[in-house]
């Protein structure tokens, strides 16, 4: 197999240290930690009280509210970092062959927040029978982030 060149021309980052590459890099150079008390959910019944959460990010600065509701949080963050990367590289999407642009996005588990919400809803309403949100599977699958990035920019 012949190795091909890959060129990284733009950066995007949504991290516990910052909501863009500049903020993240600055915090890293200053030796800051992204770990802080958990605010995303009630930790009363958990031993762990600290995590590295993304803070202060307004999703709707990047993604339309209606579209954001259809996406799990991990997909929202992936899409935002991709939007930043495309903006950073300054590419003119009307002048490139989108068939030559690929999207690779790695994640260990897909939409875990969606999974937790659906299972919790089912546990509370199981007497009504199984009834899941029609976006349950599309929001959960691990490759959906790269799919939404490709859709957003028309990459093939």
Residue ranges and their predicted role:
Residues 1-155:
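Conserved "HGTGT" condensation-loop signature of ketosynthase/thiolase-family condensing enzymes
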């Amino acid at each position: 197999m012949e190795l091909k060149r890959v060129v990284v021309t733009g950066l995007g980052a949504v991290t516990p240290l910052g909501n863009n590459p500049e903020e993240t890099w600055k915090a890293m150079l200053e030796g800051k930690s992204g770990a802080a008390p958990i605010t995303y959910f009630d930790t009363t019944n958990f031993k762990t009280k600290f995590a590295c959460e993304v803070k202060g990010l307004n999703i709707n600065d990047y993604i339309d509210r209606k579209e954001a509701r259809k996406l799990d949080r991990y997909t929202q963050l992936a899409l935002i970092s991709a939007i930043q990367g495309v903006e950073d590289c300054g590419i003119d999407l009307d002048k490139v062959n989108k068939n030559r642009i690929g999207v690779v996005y790695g994640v260990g588990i897909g939409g875990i927040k969606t999974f937790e919400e659906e299972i919790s809803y089912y546990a509370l309403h199981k007497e009504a029978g199984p009834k899941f949100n029609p976006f349950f599977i599309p929001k959960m699958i691990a490759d959906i982030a790269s799919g939404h990035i490709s859709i957003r920019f028309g990459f093939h």
